[in-house]
Amino acid sequence: MDTATILSHVDHTLLKPESTWEQIKTLCDEAMEFGCATVCIPPSFVKQAAAYVQGNLKICTVIGFPNGYNTTAAKIFETKDAVENGASEIDMVINNGLVKDRQWDDIAHEIAGIKAACLGRPLKVIIETCLLSDMEKIKLCQLAAKEEVAYVKTSTGFSTGGATREDVALLRENLPASVKVKASGGIRTLEDGQAYLDLGADRLGASALVGEARKQG
């Protein structure tokens, strides 16, 4: 798999709380130069970024990020605001407290409400695999498939761990072909990226891969 193909699966990401507009512009420029799938940026920059790229790049943003324990109403409002501001894709964080309490209906209701607020834009459900048992991961795959989301995403990158090869394989095995897998967190080399794609991931959340590609020349 060549570098360009790997980068075409990348959500070029900058979600640090101290991110500046100049850094976001650079991120967008890099993503357009290297043919990334999207940039994944904080909600506060979506409107500016959408105007800046003028339709030449998809803008992904995050909802309930990074802890996921916002109320469902707050997450739906965030989603509507992001869509209105020009977001092309939405990455939402589930409430893992609800997972631990086995409140599956509440989780499904939240996913459905946020998906409706996306107005047809792809929804990625971040499940934070490092906090979950395999049983919980599989159950969330089942819920996500039932709600017909676009992706299940491994991680925020802000918890105790990121993507692992074992988790990506587990998610892929427990999702229908219609629901894709996004691996995120700790993907630092192009070799890592290819390994996750080979395991069945379709999207990579990463901040380092464009820099790695630039070093290769």
Task: Give names to the regions the model predicted.
Residues 61, 65, 84-99, 146-161, ...:
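Glycine-rich phosphate-binding active-site loops on the catalytic face of alpha/beta enzymes
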Residues 43-67, 102-129, 162-189:
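Alpha-helix-loop-beta-strand connector modules within alpha/beta enzyme cores
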Residues 79, 89-151:
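Conserved anion-binding
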Residues 1-29, 169-181, 187-217:
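Alpha/beta catalytic cores of nucleotide-metabolism and tRNA/nucleoside-modifying enzymes
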Residues 6-14, 39-41, 58-63, 90-92, ...:
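Hydrophobic faces of well-ordered beta-strands that scaffold small-molecule active sites
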Residues 1-84, 138-139, 143-146:
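Conserved N-terminal beta1-alpha1 strand-loop-helix module at the mouth
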Residues 50, 70-81, 132-143, 166-173, ...:
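Catalytic cores of alpha/beta
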Residues 28-36, 121-124, 148-153, 175-179:
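Short, surface-exposed connector motifs at secondary-structure boundaries
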